[in-house]
A protein has these predicted regions:
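Short, well-ordered junction/capping motifs at the entry into regular secondary structure
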Residues: 1-2
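DE-rich acidic low-complexity regions and acidic surface loops
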Residues: 5, 9-328
């Protein structure tokens, strides 16, 4: 584990992760200066990305939709068009998985059934009491339960894995046609049959080892989810939980040029270390558990910078400062 060598003009970058009971926030420091701050709430058990083996509670033919019990106090909403084109294949696979408790059916050997008809109806596709695999696309708000899809996917930093699909599509934001062709060809050669992949913008220029490493992790998420379906004894049941808020935030902000990532919570420290080990094995040593007496943001001078940024006077690196006052 060697930190990237720095020249004289290079900036010392570190991330500081503050984990609190209701919130996790990540500060990015460049030479001790706070340059970015992101925070998200925690403990939302019905988070976007979570997958459930739910049960159809009520059909709503007028809306061409149904309500599904996923364990939330209010039933979740699933529209026919959100069942996804591959619903028939997924449904058949789930039935096989539930009926054979010893052996998992291999998705790579599954026969992909024709796409779901675009102008079909929920009443001809689902029945009350039926088990369905669903993923949350919109978290519950006030009087409404979560919004669902059955077009399930597993998102990583570079790739999104879509079971029962065979296409590889590359983010439109990658402009170079050579790079798009390279990524497409690369993914076609390493992905298993009957899995589709979306290549995200940040995959541009990445080596096969990094992409293959993440693909393996996403495939493992799928296997774990299917194993939970097979072992399910009660419905609804959670089969896949989107990565913790801290890892999710880090996934979008991570850069191998960071020299240290400091975390003040042991469980989150292990999650982040596992994630970094996975995508940049030679950088795993940069993740450090903070055990100091002072709150972590106080220790790194972040609290003071946050207060000054949100206060009346904002100081600049150059020595200038800005005074912000409400207009009377």
């Amino acid at each position: 584990d060697v930190a990237p060598s720095r020249g004289l003009g290079d900036v010392y970058k570190r991330q500081v992760v503050d984990v609190q009971p209701k919130e996790v926030s990540i500060a990015l420091l460049e030479d001790k200066q706070l340059v970015e701050l992101q925070s998200e709430g925690r403990n939302i058990s019905f988070s976007v990305g979570n997958m459930y083996l739910g049960r159809v509670k009520k059909l709503m033919p007028g809306l061409n939709a149904c309500f599904v019990d996923v364990g939330y106090e209010k039933d979740a909403f699933l529209h026919y068009l959100d069942l996804g084109p591959q619903f028939n294949s997924l449904e058949k696979y789930v039935k096989q998985t539930l009926s054979d408790k010893k052996k998992l059916p291999q998705i790579t050997k599954a026969t992909i059934l024709p796409d779901l008809e675009k102008d079909g109806t929920v009443a001809n596709t689902l029945k009350v009491g039926q088990e369905v695999v669903v993923q949350i696309v919109k978290e519950p708000i006030s009087t409404k339960g979560p919004r669902l899809t059955s077009e399930i996917s597993f998102a990583g930093r570079y790739l999104v894995l879509i079971p029962f699909n065979d296409k590889v599509s590359v983010s439109q934001k990658i402009k170079s046609s050579e790079e798009r062709a390279r990524l497409k060809q690369l993914l076609m050669s390493i992905k298993p049959k009957n899995f589709g992949v979306i290549v995200r913008t940040v995959a541009e220029g990445k080596r096969v080892a990094e992409l293959d490493g993440e693909l393996k992790v996403l495939l493992k998420h799928w296997e774990d989810a299917v194993t939970k379906i097979q072992k399910a004894t009660k419905f609804p049941t959670l089969i896949y939980e989107e990565t913790s808020r801290a890892v999710g935030l880090l996934r979008d902000l991570f850069n191998p040029s960071f020299e240290n990532i400091h975390v003040n919570d042991e469980a989150v420290f292990h999650e982040i270390k596992d994630y970094v080990t996975l995508i940049a094995p030679d950088r795993a040593g940069i993740v450090k558990l903070y055990k100091g007496q002072l709150p972590i943001y106080d220790n790194f001078g972040i609290t003071k910078q946050i207060k000054s940024s949100f206060g009346k006077t904002v100081s600049y690196k150059s020595g200038a400062y800005l005074i912000i006052e409400p207009v009377s």
